[in-house]
Amino acid sequence: MKMYFNNENGERYEILTRVHNEVMLLQTMNGNYIVARWIMGDSWGAGHYWMNDRSGAWKDFFKLAYEASGENMDYNEFIEMFREV
């Protein structure tokens, strides 16, 4: 069953995976990926988050996100899509 996340602007994203209920990989309706991170209370901060420390939950998250995406690219290429520019 597909799950979706709607932001305050009414934009709809498909939830591809979640890790520890703290971070989600979302896919926009036009195919772009967004990482959303739980901020506080009941709000999600969506954006292209990049963590230089790829250990712990973030390492697990990107591994699961890569597997869930089904992208035909190598893992390092995949995580580069999330580097902040």
Report residues per predicted region.
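Negatively charged, low-complexity tracts enriched in Asp/Glu with abundant Ser/Thr
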Residues: 1-18
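Detector for Asparagine
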Residues: 6-9, 21, 30-32, 52, ...
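A generic structural signal for ordered secondary structure
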Residues: 12, 29-36, 60, 78, ...
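Intrinsically disordered, low-complexity regions of eukaryotic proteins
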Residues: 13-16, 24, 55, 76
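Compositionally biased, intrinsically disordered low-complexity segments
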Residues: 18, 26, 82-85
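Short aromatic-glycine-(Arg/Gly/Cys) micro-motifs in beta-strand/loop hairpins
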Residues: 20-48, 64
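Mixed-charge, Lys/Arg-enriched low-complexity segments
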Residues: 43-85
